[in-house]
UniProtKB/Swiss-Prot annotation:
Organism, as annotated: Ruminiclostridium cellulolyticum (strain ATCC 35319 / DSM 5812 / JCM 6584 / H10) (Clostridium cellulolyticum)
Pfam families linked: Enolase_C (PF00113), Enolase_N (PF03952)
Gene: eno
UniProt key word Cytoplasm: yes
Catalysis: reaction(s): (2R)-2-phosphoglycerate = phosphoenolpyruvate + H2O
Entry keyword set: Cytoplasm, Glycolysis, Lyase, Magnesium, Metal-binding, Secreted
Keyword Kinase found: no
Protein name (database record): Enolase
GO annotation, cellular component aspect: cell surface; extracellular region; phosphopyruvate hydratase complex
Protein's pathway: Carbohydrate degradation; glycolysis; pyruvate from D-glyceraldehyde 3-phosphate: step 4/5
Cofactor(s) needed: Mg(2+)
Function: Catalyzes the reversible conversion of 2-phosphoglycerate (2-PG) into phosphoenolpyruvate (PEP). It is essential for the degradation of carbohydrates via glycolysis.
GO molecular function: magnesium ion binding; phosphopyruvate hydratase activity
Cofactor note: Binds a second Mg(2+) ion via substrate during catalysis.
Highest classification ranks of the organism: Bacteria, Bacillati, Bacillota, Clostridia, Eubacteriales
Enzyme kind, highest EC tier: lyase
Amino acid sequence: MKQYIPIESVFAREILDSRGNPTVEVEVIAEGGFIGRASVPSGASTGAFEAVELRDENSGRYMGKGVETAVDNVNNTIAPEVEGMNVFDQVAVDKLMIDLDGTPNKERLGANAILGVSLAVAKAAAEALGLGLYQYIGGVNAKTLPVPMMNIINGGKHADNSVNIQEFMIMPVGAENFKEALRMCAEVFHNLKKVLHSKGLSTAVGDEGGFAPNLETDEQAIQVILEAVEKAGYKPGNDFRIAIDAAATEMYQEDGSYFFWKSNIRKSKEEMVDYWADLAGKYPIISLEDGVSEEDWEGWKLLTERLGSKIQLVGDDLFVTNTKRLEKGIKQGVANSILIKVNQIGTLTETLDAIQMANRAGYTAVTSHRSGETEDATIADIAVATNSGQIKTGAPSRTDRVAKYNQLLRIEEELGEVAEFPGLKAWYNLK
């Protein structure tokens, strides 16, 4: 017999995200008083192919960034259609909202409106069954805790400093479990603060909790991180690997070259590939995200041919959590991993479809936050539900980031002996 609990009410409100910008929060109540609440994140460096985040564009309110239109779309357009539907029928609810919107990129109702409802429905359903969200989405096989990909030095569009590359991250591949992984990362983070301080560099933190010092070169960021790893008593390569998010789309020029605007250096796509290969040869780098632009398919092919069997090549702007873009990438043999951001596509169903497609093609999936976050920790549950093996959700600083890590600690505790921490096995597709 199919279990049926109707959705009684859907309500949205405008709240603030971690950058002080408005975002959408949705509450779904199912019969019996089961409540699901979800809030929607927002990115600073966004891919051109992402689903549309609806903003009011009213300059007299929140400098044009209000989301009252999206909130109204939930309360007046989506709610009347979704109320009465089965809270367990996630696919049907998501499909109804996609059809209601009727555009390929959700620009009519807004991906921020649709996603808020989608996630809140899943949370209400989990609540009704008395399950953790990760168990509801992932079932009995949801047991893999992700290796954190922790952003501890920021540059690019995320920081007003001299560093062109957007994110330098640490990955505690030598940890035995998630709890230990988190401790190791926190210790490196605090040691990095000491290293930067000793060099007279800034220790103020950016949007994602990482430091944003003015460095002489981008490469120096890797060097100070490795110094901090050693100071914390760990071994680079064994205990920690480095991950980089280049956000190269931000550097891409109309003539097909790449401009490192903070240091006034221009590189061809071939030189970009050489640059990454050189860094990957010198340092214990395991992952490179958006090493070339979302538009540069030829550059992606060169990069994948050169480094695709050695390190993880993550498509973020390239794939935008979109199965059509991912399918094209798989057919062309570019990248070997996809970054998963729920708000790039706008529903839980489409997010899970993208992860499934990636896994079937032998691509890894990295569950990710956005630079504008809230206290909502849904992505922690999604990472475990899908056994994705990796999560990117900022430094161990700022509650909007730490909320996700703390939720993963709770999940690991709840899973007990069943919990698995993959370490280097997360990169099953590398030689």
